[in-house]
């Protein structure tokens, strides 16, 4: 990187830590902020507020400012739980308006090659939620990646002995894709066409 002031170099370094932001993008963002100094304070304030106020729901582990979150505390169908990898997957399903139950966010997917085991995910908490007898169906909505499929298979093996119906999103979602990037109509078709495992 060219030599800039320490402050600008630090800003670019922090921006590069964001997913999908390389050095050129980080520089472009930094220079944009410098051109619009009024935005700097608003951005800094928003970042601080997110850090202070946003946390995981103690029930489903979605991102929320309230505990429990609005989905867990609302009048949704508590007999169906949709299991997703990340909070942004939950948001994609909510955008489709195809699912009326509750969620459980694993905070990742199994990946033995990367050292991610069941203990690293919110699987134990999911199994605890299923013990009450209220849940009739678990919809597994992990991504259609190697890790997502491994997670779905593992969850199916854990849940089936509980005599709870286990379903999987239909394969209308392209293999190798993340729910976060799929349009709402495709997600809706996938939810409606889910199949039992």
Swiss-Prot record:
An MF annotation (GO) of this entry: zinc ion binding
Gene3D superfamilies to which the protein is assigned, alphabetical: 3.30.60.80, 3.40.1360.10, 6.10.250.240, RecR Domain 1
ZnF C4-type span: 57-72
Gene that encodes the chain: recR
Cross-referenced InterPro entries: DNA_Rcmb_RecR, Rcmb_RecR, Rcmb_RecR_Znf, TOPRIM_dom, TOPRIM_RecR
Protein known as: Recombination protein RecR
Role noted for this protein: May play a role in DNA repair. It seems to be involved in an RecBC-independent recombinational process of DNA repair. It may act with RecF and RecO.
Family classification: Belongs to the RecR family.
Organism the protein comes from: Geobacter sp. (strain M21)
Keyword field: DNA damage, DNA recombination, DNA repair, Metal-binding, Zinc, Zinc-finger
GO BP annotations, alphabetical order: DNA recombination; DNA repair
Cystine bridges: none
Domain Toprim: 79-174
Domain of life where this protein originates: Bacteria
